[in-house]
Structure formats: C-alpha cells, structure tokens
C-alpha cells in the first residue's frame, strides 16, 4: 500500500503542472510534449519493464522503494496528464487572468483560482494513479523484490507457486475497491455538474 500511496502523491504533482503548462502554451511545443508524456502508454509494458530493469541494474535501483515508486509513477503519469488536460479544456483561463491582474502571482493564481476549479479531474487523476500502481504487475516483476515486493508481485508468485484461497479473497477486495473508487468518482462528477 505504501508504494501506491507514494505513487499517487508523487505522480500527481508533475503531471498536473505539465497539463497546466501544455494548456497555456501555444505553437507546436505542446503537441510534442504531450506525445512525450504519453510515451509510457504507447510503448508495451513489457518493453518498459525490461528497459527499466536494465537501467535500474546500472543505477542500483532494483529492489528499492525509490525504484518501484519511480517505475509505477512513470506508468501512471500519462493517465494523470490526460485526465487533468481534459479538465482544463472546460476551464476558463480568464478567471486566472483576472486574479493575476489583481496582483496575484502566477503560482498563487493557479493554487487559489485554477486548482480548486479543476479539483474533480485532479482527484480522478490521483485515483487513476493509485489504481494503476495497484494493478501494475509487469514492472513489479522486474524491479521489485526482497523487502520491497509489491502486493501484486506477491499475489502473482502465490498464484504460480501455491494454491491458497487468500489470493481469491484479496482479488475480490481489489475489484470491490476499484468499483467503489469508480462509483465515488462518478458520484462526485455528477454532483459537480449540478
């Protein structure tokens, strides 16, 4: 759970700022950067896992918490960028401009005007990052181990090595958690529209 919590928090800061920057930029640069942020979705997960393993072997990050969190965050970043960018499309930037014309700095205007108005996409993005980390088994098989084996890796190993009803119970709980988070997200977005 600690991997998913850290991944959820770490994954949201950079992509939220990236989506905001892409939204405010003009020209060709936003399209190129947007494609860059989507690369982990475009490349097959097994190739990302092998590449991550080889890179981590050279850097000494295999079987470390920092390595696992970084790998999980890399896989979740595209989902956060897409979700926040779609939320920013319906946001009127004139509101932030007004705040800045009244003396607020750009960071203060973003934190006090823009961020509260895009909170539903931000919360949804955080939940997606959490669920992505929860579900990411391919990369975990390559970079996690020892004291830092993720729950999904332990479940995969248990399914492979032993027959235990605990895995079925945990899987049911994970599905129920995912459905509950999805329902909460839908309920929150309906409340926001009204």
PLM region descriptions:
Residues 85-96, 100, 104-115, 164, ...:
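C-terminal transmembrane helix and the adjacent membrane-cytosol boundary/short C-terminal tail
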Residues 29-30, 46-75, 107, 143-146:
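Membrane-interfacial helix termini and adjacent extracytoplasmic/periplasmic loops
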Residues 49-59, 127-133, 160, 186:
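A structural signal for multi-pass alpha-helical bundles of membrane permease subunits
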Residues 73-74, 80-88, 92-93, 106-135:
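Transmembrane alpha-helices
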Residues 1-12:
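Single conserved hydrophobic/aromatic residue that forms the stacking wall/gate
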Residues 24-33, 61-65, 106, 120-122, ...:
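Membrane-helix interface segments
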Residues 17-51, 96:
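Cytoplasmic-entry segments and transmembrane alpha-helices of multi-pass inner-membrane transporters
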Residues 134-184, 188:
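Interhelical loop and adjacent transmembrane-helix boundary motif
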């Amino acid at each position: 759970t600690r991997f998913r919590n850290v991944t959820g928090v770490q994954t949201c800061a950079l992509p939220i700022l990236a989506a905001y920057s892409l939204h405010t930029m003009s020209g060709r640069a936003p399209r190129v950067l947007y494609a860059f942020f989507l690369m982990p979705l475009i490349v097959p997960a097994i190739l990302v896992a092998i590449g991550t393993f080889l890179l981590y072997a050279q850097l000494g990050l295999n079987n470390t918490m920092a390595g696992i969190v970084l790998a999980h965050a890399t896989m979740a970043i595209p989902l956060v960028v897409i979700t926040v960018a779609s939320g920013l499309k319906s946001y009127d930037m004139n509101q932030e401009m007004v705040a800045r014309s009244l003396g607020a700095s750009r960071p203060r205007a973003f934190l006090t005007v823009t961020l509260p108005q895009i909170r539903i996409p931000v919360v949804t993005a955080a939940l997606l990052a959490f669920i992505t980390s929860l579900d990411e088994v391919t990369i975990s098989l390559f970079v996690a181990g020892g004291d830092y084996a993720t729950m999904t890796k332990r479940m995969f190993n248990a399914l492979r090595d032993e027959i235990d009803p605990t895995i079925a119970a945990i899987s049911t709980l994970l599905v129920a958690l995912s459905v509950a988070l999805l329902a909460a997200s839908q309920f929150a977005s309906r409340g926001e529209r009204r």
